[in-house]
Amino acid sequence: MGSKLSKKKKGYNVNDEKAKDKDKKAEGAGTEEEGTQKESEPQAAADATEVKESAEEKPKDAADGEAKAEEKEADKAAAKEEAPKAEPEKSEGAAEEQPEPAPAPEQEAAAPGPAAGGEAPKAGEASAESTGAADGAPQEEGEAKKTEAPAAGPEAKSDAAPAASDSKPSTEPAPSSKETPAASEAPSSAAKAPAPAAPAAEPQAEAPVASSEQSVAVKE
């Protein structure tokens, strides 16, 4: 009886040790699994935080990009506004510079103009007086006055020639206008007052000479 009990105890002890080893192994495996789970949880949490941070950074980057784009657009708009402003300023400056030289020739041309106009009416008045006197007086007196009228014509032309020579080339047309009244005076006086052919030819010959002298003075 005693031997059986001892065997049983020994066997029980052996079984107990095996069971304990199994329990320890099971507990170790359980602890390892728990450890892995615990480790994976922080990793998952870290991944979640990283995803959140990246998601937050993306809107920030997008906002920064939009702000930069708006700034670029504003700079472009400002540059476009400044460019048209600079162009009108340039055009205004050019317009101010261009009219400045223009008034000088205009004034110079206006100065000889009235002088020529003033001299031409005087010559016309002299011719009118000479023709009126020639109509009322005898033929002999008309011939004498005709000779005086052409003499006065060259004098007026000679007076006008220096003035034309002093002026610039832009005022050269003025002498031509002065020459026409003087040239018309001689034929008109010759046609109105009946006179011999010889005295009438002499004034006409004098008129071309005076015109040639005037042209020479203008060229000088």
Curated annotation (Swiss-Prot):
Gene expressing this chain: Basp1
Biased composition (Low complexity): 105-137, 149-213
Chief location bin: membrane
Cross-link (Glycyl lysine isopeptide (Lys-Gly) (interchain with G-Cter in SUMO2)): K25, K85, K157
Pfam families hit by this protein: BASP1
Family: Belongs to the BASP1 family.
GO cellular component term, pick one: growth cone
Sequence ranges of Basic residues compositional bias: 1-11
UniProt biased composition (Basic and acidic residues): 15-27, 49-93
UniProt keyword annotations, A-Z: Calmodulin-binding, Cell membrane, Cell projection, Isopeptide bond, Lipoprotein, Membrane, Myristate, Phosphoprotein, Ubl conjugation
Topology in membrane: Lipid-anchor
Modified residues (Phosphoserine): S40, S91, S127, S130, S158, S165, S167, S170, S189, S212
GO biological process, one term: negative regulation of DNA-templated transcription
Positions of modified residues (Phosphothreonine): T31, T36
Species name: Rattus norvegicus (Rat)
The protein, known as: Brain acid soluble protein 1
Region described as Disordered: 1-220
GO MF, one example: transcription cis-regulatory region binding
Ubl conjugation as UniProt keyword: yes
Keyword match Magnesium: no
Places the protein is found: Cell membrane; Cell projection, Growth cone
Expression across tissues: Brain.
UniProt cross-references to InterPro entries, sorted A to Z: BASP1
Covalent lipidation (N-myristoyl glycine), chain numbering: G2
